[in-house]
Amino acid sequence: KKNSIAKKNQSWINAIENNFKVDDYESLIPNADLVINLTPDKEHHHVVQVLQKLMKKNSCLGYSHGFNIVEFGEIIRKDITVIMVAPKCPGTEVREEYKRGFGVPTLIAVHNENDIRQIGLDIAKAWSFSIGSHRAGVLESSFIAEVKSDLMGEQTILCGMLQTASLLCYEKLIANKNDPAYASKLIQNGWETITESLKHGGITLMMDRLSNASKIRAYNISEKIKKILSSLFQKHMNDIISGEFSHKMMQDWQNNNKQLLDWRNKNKNTSFEKAPVYHNKIPEQEYYDHGILMIAILKAGIELSFETMLNSGIIAESAYYESLHELPLIANTIARKKLYEMNKV
C-alpha cells in the first residue's frame, strides 16, 4: 500500500532489510508473471477483485490457503492460472525453517477451472521449491482437500486442543498448589519440548521418553480422552465438510470479528497468560516426567484428528500433515508468546 511505503512501517522495513523490491500495487502487479496473495482470508475477496484488474493476461495468481476459492466461491478471470502452495505451519515458521536451510511440508494444488494453459502444477512445484519445501516434502492435493483438512486440524489438535489444554493444565497445577511461575513455564515450553520428539519419531518416540509406568498411565488417560471427545471431533468435521463452520466464520467477519475478538480478549486475561515468569531452567526430561497429562492429550488429539479426517475421505498424507507434522510448529508459537501469538498468526 502507498501509505505503508510512505510511513515506512514494519512490513516495509522487513522487505527492505531482506532485499525485496518494494513498490505499490499499480507499479508492480501489471508486470508480474506470478502474484501471490498472502493476505488474511477475510480480505481475500476485496484484494482478489483489485488484483484481477491489474494483472496482465495469462499471468498466475497464487494462494497459500484455498478458503476464498472453496468456501467463498471466488470467480477468477479465465486467462489467469490459479495455484496454491500451502505450507503446513504459520508464515513465521516458513521463514525460520528456510533460514536454517530446511523447509516445511507443503500441499500444492491447481484450481482446475483456471488452468487453461496446463502450467499450474509446474509453477506450484517451482514456488514450493523456492521456499525449501522440497527438503521436507511436497504433496499434490486439491483446493477442497486443503481447506477441509486445514480447518479440521486447526479447530482440533493444532490450535483448539493446545489452547484449551494449556488453560486446563495450568488450572490443575495451581489447584494442586504448584508454583504459578513454574506451572506456566512447564506448559508454555513443555508443548514445544515434547512435540519436538514427534518430528523425529512420532507418537512412539514421544511415549518412549516416559518410564514404563508413566507410559501406561499416559496411554490410559489418552484412551479416556478419545472416548470423551470423539463425538465433538466428528461434529467439527461434519460442520467443516458441510460448510456450516465457514458460514458462521464469515458471518463474524461481517460483524467486525466481534466473536473472534471477544475470544482473544478472554484468553488475554486468563491467569495462564498473566502468570509470573519462572527464571530457573527446567531440564528437558522434566517436561516429560511432569507432563504426563500433556502427553496423553497430544496422543489423543493427534489420533482423533487423523482418524476423523481419514473417515471423512481425506487422504492419509494430508491428514498426517494436519494432525501430527504441523503440531511442533504451532507449539513453537506458544513457547514464544503463550497463546497470544498462536491466536494472532
From Swiss-Prot:
TM segment ranges: none
Catalytic residues (UniProt): H65
Assigned keywords, A-Z: Amino-acid biosynthesis, Branched-chain amino acid biosynthesis, Magnesium, Metal-binding, NADP, Oxidoreductase, Repeat
GO BP annotations listed: isoleucine biosynthetic process; L-valine biosynthetic process
Domain KARI C-terminal knotted residues, every copy: 142-286, 287-345
Enzyme class: oxidoreductase
Binding-site list for Mg(2+) 1: D150, E154
Matches recorded under PROSITE patterns: KARI_C (PS51851), KARI_N (PS51850)
Binding site for NADP(+): S11, D41, K42, E43, G91
Ranges of residues in domain KARI N-terminal Rossmann: 1-141
Entry binding sites for Mg(2+) 2: D150, E322, E326
GO terms for cellular component: cytosol
Cofactor: how and how many bound: Binds 2 magnesium ions per subunit.
Required cofactor names: Mg(2+)
Recorded catalytic activity of this chain's protein: (2R)-2,3-dihydroxy-3-methylbutanoate + NADP(+) = (2S)-2-acetolactate + NADPH + H(+); (2R,3R)-2,3-dihydroxy-3-methylpentanoate + NADP(+) = (S)-2-ethyl-2-hydroxy-3-oxobutanoate + NADPH + H(+)
GO MF terms, alphabetically ordered: ketol-acid reductoisomerase activity; metal ion binding; NADP binding
EC assignment: 1.1.1.86
Annotated pathway: Amino-acid biosynthesis; L-isoleucine biosynthesis; L-isoleucine from 2-oxobutanoate: step 2/4; Amino-acid biosynthesis; L-valine biosynthesis; L-valine from pyruvate: step 2/4
NCBIfam families: ilvC (TIGR00465)
Function, in words: Involved in the biosynthesis of branched-chain amino acids (BCAA). Catalyzes an alkyl-migration followed by a ketol-acid reduction of (S)-2-acetolactate (S2AL) to yield (R)-2,3-dihydroxy-isovalerate. In the isomerase reaction, S2AL is rearranged via a Mg-dependent methyl migration to produce 3-hydroxy-3-methyl-2-ketobutyrate (HMKB). In the reductase reaction, this 2-ketoacid undergoes a metal-dependent reduction by NADPH to yield (R)-2,3-dihydroxy-isovalerate.
Family: Belongs to the ketol-acid reductoisomerase family.
Name of protein: Ketol-acid reductoisomerase (NADP(+))
Source organism of this protein record: Buchnera aphidicola subsp. Uroleucon sonchi
